Amino acid sequence: MQASAAFTHRTGIDTICLRPVAVFDAEGYERMLKSSPRPAGVGTAWHMGVHIDVRDVAEATLRAVETTFRGHVRLLLCANDIADRRPTLELVAEHLPHTDWRGGREFTDEPFRSLIDCSRAQEVLGFRPRYGWPGR
């Protein structure tokens, strides 16, 4: 990504780096939902249940190609919810017990809310993920 930023700086050619996490398609969802017992999640400490549907990645990619944005930007992409049966606060308490919680009421109102803020992708591309974890 530093190379992309340097490239844009040197040449003036625009670059958008999309950073999706744990991309799932229909078969991937099915495999995860059938695994028994389900791994401490897909929601283990290394990504805390953050995921995105391949269809949303395709949509963000199309928007990145068609945007009028100028310059260089890195954009995180993830679903609005997490890939786990346990609420987000439980995952945080389990995997990060010594970390002071700074989340707000939004995690009470949306107990499976993702810990990743992807609002920049909405600002730059008008992108909002449409797909969440199946069954939710």
Annotate each predicted stretch with a short phrase:
Residues M1-T15:
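Active-site Tyr-X1-5-Lys
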Residues V21-F24, D81:
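Glycine-rich beta-alpha junction loops
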Residues V23-A26, R31-L75:
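Alpha-helical substrate-binding/gating segment
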Residues A58-C118, E123-V124:
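Mid/C-terminal beta-alpha module of Rossmann-like enzyme folds, strongest
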Residues R130-R136:
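Gly/Pro- and small hydrophobic-enriched strand-loop and loop-to-helix capping segments
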